[in-house]
């Protein structure tokens, strides 16, 4: 696995719930690809998850991936919570169904296709990759709003 890819992901939501968007900046051997999309009625957490899923789905073969997000929800979910959710049949410690389990399961499936290193950055402090992903996520929101 010598293919190394950088993914910068972000989600945005105007209202929570409300119209939302996701954005991904993919960098491979210096070449950049931008991905974005949105949904009419969603949450910020769903859009953060969707960005990571869509970024990983865009990779056609197994890769080493450095995925950078500003979402503590995604970071904690993937690195801390998911192992126990899976053991409990996608239930929380309080025996409640995991919120956004559909997307967590999709993310788990995509992560298992690759060797992913997860990185967290604070949002909106000028990190170039994160700022680009944020702009793309907002483009996703704008396109959804324009279709109304």
UniProtKB/Swiss-Prot annotation:
This is Ribonuclease H. The lineage of its organism: Bacteria, Pseudomonadati, Pseudomonadota, Gammaproteobacteria, Pseudomonadales. Endonuclease that specifically degrades the RNA of RNA-DNA hybrids. GO terms for molecular function: magnesium ion binding; nucleic acid binding; RNA-DNA hybrid ribonuclease activity. Its cofactor is Mg(2+). One of its GO terms (cellular component) is cytoplasm. GO terms for biological process: DNA replication, removal of RNA primer. It comes from Pseudomonas putida (strain W619). Keywords: Cytoplasm, Endonuclease, Hydrolase, Magnesium, Metal-binding, Nuclease. Belongs to the RNase H family. Binds 1 Mg(2+) ion per subunit. May bind a second metal ion at a regulatory site, or after substrate binding. It comes from the Bacteria. It is found in: Cytoplasm. Mg(2+) 1 binds at residues 10, 48, 70. The keyword Calcium does not apply. Its EC number is 3.1.26.4. The gene is rnhA.
């Amino acid at each position: 696995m010598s293919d190394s890819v950088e993914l910068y992901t972000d989600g945005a939501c105007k209202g929570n719930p409300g119209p939302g968007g996701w954005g991904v900046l993919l960098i491979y051997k210096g070449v950049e690809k931008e991905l974005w999309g949105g949904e009419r009625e969603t949450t910020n957490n769903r859009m953060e998850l969707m960005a990571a899923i869509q970024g990983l789905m865009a990779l056609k073969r197994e890769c080493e991936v450095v995925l950078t997000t500003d979402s503590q929800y995604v970071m904690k979910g993937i690195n801390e919570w998911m192992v126990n959710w899976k053991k409990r049949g996608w239930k929380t410690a309080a025996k409640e169904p995991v919120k956004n389990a559909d997307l967590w399961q999709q993310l788990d499936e995509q992560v298992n296709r690759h060797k992913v290193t997860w990185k967290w950055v604070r949002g909106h402090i000028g990190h170039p990759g994160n700022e680009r992903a944020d702009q793309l996520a907002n483009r996703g929101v704008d396109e959804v709003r324009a279709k109304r």
